[in-house]
From Swiss-Prot:
Protein name, per record: Phosphoadenosine 5'-phosphosulfate reductase
Entries under Pfam families matching the protein: PAPS_reduct (PF01507)
Main location per the UniProt record: cytoplasm
Annotated GO MF terms: phosphoadenylyl-sulfate reductase (thioredoxin) activity
PANTHER family recorded: PHOSPHOADENOSINE PHOSPHOSULFATE REDUCTASE (PTHR46509:SF1)
Keyword annotations from UniProtKB, A to Z: Cytoplasm, Oxidoreductase
Reaction(s) catalysed (UniProt annotation): [thioredoxin]-disulfide + sulfite + adenosine 3',5'-bisphosphate + 2 H(+) = [thioredoxin]-dithiol + 3'-phosphoadenylyl sulfate
Compartments, record wording: Cytoplasm
First-level EC class: oxidoreductase
């Protein structure tokens, strides 16, 4: 199947192409990737996408799916967490539980300035509208993630983004290139039902706050419990935006959740 389209994809070769040429090449591959199961996609990516691989996780509501899916095929794959210092206590507990139960190779990255130092310098950025939120995200998520990808020499970045999660993710492809790195989304076409059945089949758990009515979990100060009439994306960043910058190109907004 995909052997007819690509063997080992050389990132440097693709980066030498124009954006239009890259799009055509990636579109050909994505057509065939859409026909594979998530497990088959992961296997293909590990075999055919060059360089070091890593998976990012915010250890959110459905994080166990991607962490299990990828680590079962490459046990030592680095799991990158950007710790803002403002995660829920339940999130830190969930990180410890999954790291132990799945034997994860966890790599934690943080901002160069501590949370308290940032508040002293800039105030509570998340209370300063879109500009404040974007600066906060750039300091605490974007820069630490870029540093992680560079230090770990990552060429292929796995993420658990799904099209169903928000309007901004509805058109995401399985394979893309973002800021000079392969981005691979093996469960991008999964529904909430698919996620639920996978968790149940493999004896995995949702984030503890799922039982308390949270659909999406990030920092304590920019996460809301779901209320009737709200979409999932409206439970984050006061409904002002869905993405936090991690999954956006440099020429887009500075500052997307995982």
């Amino acid at each position: 199947m995909l052997d007819s389209v690509a063997s080992t994809l050389q990132l440097s070769e693709l980066l030498s192409l124009t954006k239009a040429e890259q799009s055509i090449r990636l579109a050909e591959i994505n057509v065939e990737l859409e026909m594979l199961s998530a497990q088959e996609r992961v296997a293909w990516a590990l075999q055919n996408l060059e360089g070091a691989h890593a998976v990012s996780s915010s250890f959110g509501i459905q994080a166990a799916v991607m962490l299990h899916l990828v680590s079962k095929q490459q046990a030592d794959i680095p799991v990158i967490l950007t710790d803002t210092g403002y995660l829920f206590p339940e999130t830190y507990q969930f990180i410890d539980e999954l790291t132990k139960s799945l034997n994860l190779n966890l790599k934690v990255y943080r901002a160069n300035e501590s949370a308290n130092w940032q508040e002293a310098r800039y105030g509570k950025l998340w209370e300063q509208g879109i500009e404040g939120i974007e600066k906060y995200n750039k300091l605490n998520k974007v820069e630490p993630m870029r540093r992680a990808l560079n230090e770990l020499n990552v060429k292929t970045w796995f993420s658990g983004l799904r099209r169903e999660q928000s309007q901004s993710r509805a058109g995401l492809p399985i394979l893309s290139i973002q800021n000079g790195v392969f981005k691979f989304l093996p469960v991008v076409d999964w529904s909430n039902k698919d996620v639920h059945y996978y968790l149940k089949e493999h004896g995995l758990s949702y984030h503890p706050l799922w039982e308390q009515g949270y659909l999406s979990v990030g920092d304590t100060h920019t996460t809301q419990k779901w209320e009737p009439g709200m979409s999932e994306e409206e439970t984050r960043f006061f409904g002002l935006k869905r993405e936090c910058g991690l999954h956006e190109e440099d020429n887009e907004q500075d500052g997307s959740g995982i």
